[in-house]
Amino acid sequence: MAKYQKLGRDSSARKALFRAVVTALFDKERIETTEAKAKAVQSIAEEMITLAKRGDLHARRQALAYIYDESVVTKLFNQIAPRYADRNGGYTRVIRTGVRKGDAAPMAILELV
């Protein structure tokens, strides 16, 4: 059994999907996606916020290497990270919302706390 969910994609497509979902999450602060994608991306988003809390140049460059949009990185470091200055983890939550109409895929909302 795999240690992570493959989500029906090869490794490069999966990495691109995770980067896109993380970028969208920090841009919108709340996204609806499948439950499997939300759970897979949740830990990556938490790591990015912890990185942003460090706030140094190296952390910013590491975030820029992962997040697609530079303006989203700026928002992460200037607006989102200070919000969680006194919080040690648990920056996101997954709320199950039922199933998608077309294919009955379990859906969930991934949002910043």
From Swiss-Prot:
SUPFAM superfamilies membership: Prokaryotic ribosomal protein L17
GO cellular component: cytosolic large ribosomal subunit
Highest taxon of the lineage: Bacteria
Name of this chain's protein: Large ribosomal subunit protein bL17
Keyword Ribosomal protein: yes
GO molecular function, one term: structural constituent of ribosome
Listed transmembrane segments: none
Matching InterPro entries: Ribosomal_bL17 (IPR000456), Ribosomal_bL17_CS (IPR047859), Ribosomal_bL17_sf (IPR036373)
Quaternary structure annotation from Swiss-Prot or TrEMBL: Part of the 50S ribosomal subunit. Contacts protein L32.
Organism: Symbiobacterium thermophilum (strain DSM 24528 / JCM 14929 / IAM 14863 / T)
Keywords assigned: Ribonucleoprotein, Ribosomal protein
Any Pfam family matching the protein: Ribosomal_L17
Family from the record: Belongs to the bacterial ribosomal protein bL17 family.
GO biological process: translation
